[in-house]
Amino acid sequence: MKTLIILCAPCGVGKSTIRELIAQRNQLPDFACIDTDAVGLNWHVYKGTERENQYQTDCLKRADEISGDKNIFFVSAGMNPPNFYNYVDLPELIGRTFFIGMTCSDEEITKRLKARPAERRTDSDDFIKSQHEYSAWFKGSRGKFQLFVDNTNQTLEETAGLIEDFIKSL
């Protein structure tokens, strides 16, 4: 049975950057490091349809296929514990699931989102506000995660190290 580790966080907190660094450092050779953006599914195809709640399940099924025989370190903005437990039908090969929540200060989220390329459409006040609100949910829901990281004052290497150490301890 596979182990599934889900790193979830608001946009602009550094999920994808941390995933890339963890993959490069190769400290977790038994894990495939997979980002939601890399599974080949588009949220906008599901959004507002009767299949909206199927998106997370389809992403995980695809991640399971991509991972081959390896465990899965999966990075997602939307696959937080409530969404996972309410909407996801797990592939049968997944035996254990752990959640890592990550956030940073609202100021840091704003700075990071405004620095992204315009085509990512993350620099509007409404979008940034939505990520601040999502971040507040994370901060108020620390206990829903087996590991919770506030990376406001941490380097990428420190954050990656915390996550790697947690996963190795399982």
Where are these regions (language model features)?
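Walker A/P-loop
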Residues: S16
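Small-molecule kinase domains that catalyze NTP-dependent phosphoryl transfer to phosphate-bearing small molecules
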Residues: E119-L162, L170
